[in-house]
Amino acid sequence: MTDAFQKLFQQMLQSGQEMARAFNPALEHFDMRAMEKLVPTIPADMLEMWFGKTFNREGLDAKTRLLLTIGAITVQGALAEPQLRMTVRQALAAGATKREIAETIFQMSMFGGLPAMQKALEIAQSVYAEEDEE
């Protein structure tokens, strides 16, 4: 990263923190990882409402929607690690297999690149390990 880009990035972070502080002082130090620990998976009723038949009765089921979400998050690279961890957990809860999740991530290598795919696979594997421990 160049110095100019690093400076711009820091300014953007600072601006975001100031905006969060202006909207809600409690959001200044919000950490998605804390939210992940608080709510590791969404209750089945809410999952079905958001991703399933309530809003889209004839469309995609929750599992398919979550696999698509995993694909979209994978392309973002390491920017959305907590979101990917939570979505992998949700997909498993919705009936997706580890193989389906891995294939979804593999497919995204063409769009997000190999580093993004590798990072997403590492994250998914860590979620699998956590699930196996439970």
From Swiss-Prot:
Compartments, as annotated in UniProt: Cell membrane
Pfam families to which the protein is assigned, alphabetical: CMD (PF02627)
Gene3D superfamilies: AhpD-like (1.20.1290.10)
Transmembrane helix among keywords: no
Gene Ontology cellular-component annotations: plasma membrane
Top-level lineage group: Bacteria
Membrane topology summary: Peripheral membrane protein
Database matches in PANTHER family: 4-CARBOXYMUCONOLACTONE DECARBOXYLASE FAMILY PROTEIN, CARBOXYMUCONOLACTONE DECARBOXYLASE-LIKE DOMAIN-CONTAINING PROTEIN
Protein task: May have a role in the regulation of NDH-1 biosynthesis.
Protein name listed in UniProt: Uncharacterized 15.0 kDa protein in nqo9-nqo10 intergenic region
